[in-house]
From Swiss-Prot:
The gene is SWEET9. Residues 10-96, 132-216 form the MtN3/slv domain. One of its GO terms (cellular component) is plasma membrane. It comes from Arabidopsis thaliana. One of its GO terms (molecular function) is sugar transmembrane transporter activity. It is found in: Cell membrane; Cytoplasmic vesicle membrane; Golgi apparatus, trans-Golgi network membrane. This is Bidirectional sugar transporter SWEET9. The keyword Cell wall biogenesis/degradation does not apply. GO terms for biological process: nectar secretion.
Amino acid sequence: MFLKVHEIAFLFGLLGNIVSFGVFLSPVPTFYGIYKKKSSKGFQSIPYICALASATLLLYYGIMKTHAYLIISINTFGCFIEISYLFLYILYAPREAKISTLKLIVICNIGGLGLLILLVNLLVPKQHRVSTVGWVCAAYSLAVFASPLSVMRKVIKTKSVEYMPFLLSLSLTLNAVMWFFYGLLIKDKFIAMPNILGFLFGVAQMILYMMYQGSTKTDLPTENQLANKTDVNEVPIVAVELPDVGSDNVEGSVRPMK
């Protein structure tokens, strides 16, 4: 006996909840390491700020939308876990990172959501409110999927997958597949569309992981190292041409003064 469309949609939504639960929990080892070392270890808070914004918006969207229990359930948990991650990050991050993270939380998560709710209720006709919030949710979902771009850039530069766990990349890919089919089957473009990009980014991250797994890590130059480079004004007879940061030529060159 074949399942009906709404039953298949429920199945994908349920699987999406299960995989999303894993996605939300996948950074736990990272934050446990932060807790043990009492340091943020160079990790960035932006992906978690975007994830919290997306979860709160999708929760608001689910509340406005009829019978969106699967969306409400997972995003309620998502809000709780992302707030927990950000609390740990702020607790152990350097002072500048703490301040910038708190500013972003106030602007994006508190101010942004509050302003959206206010504008939607004041300016948008009731029959268009769900679609308006849906478009905003889709835009935020794209921001969440695009946020690992900075991490991918760091992986390419350092040739290290330290900051990009494979489990997280795999979970994001599976998560995007489940929610795409859920959105497709219930004819919700605001759920389906962003997950196409989510799938592509997830696959790209897994490819990077396979390329650089086991590679020797290349440390990026620190500010002190850059400041201590030889000054050409200190060399009276020859001019020293220093290599650009990130160049394969680490020796530089020496040429006579003209």
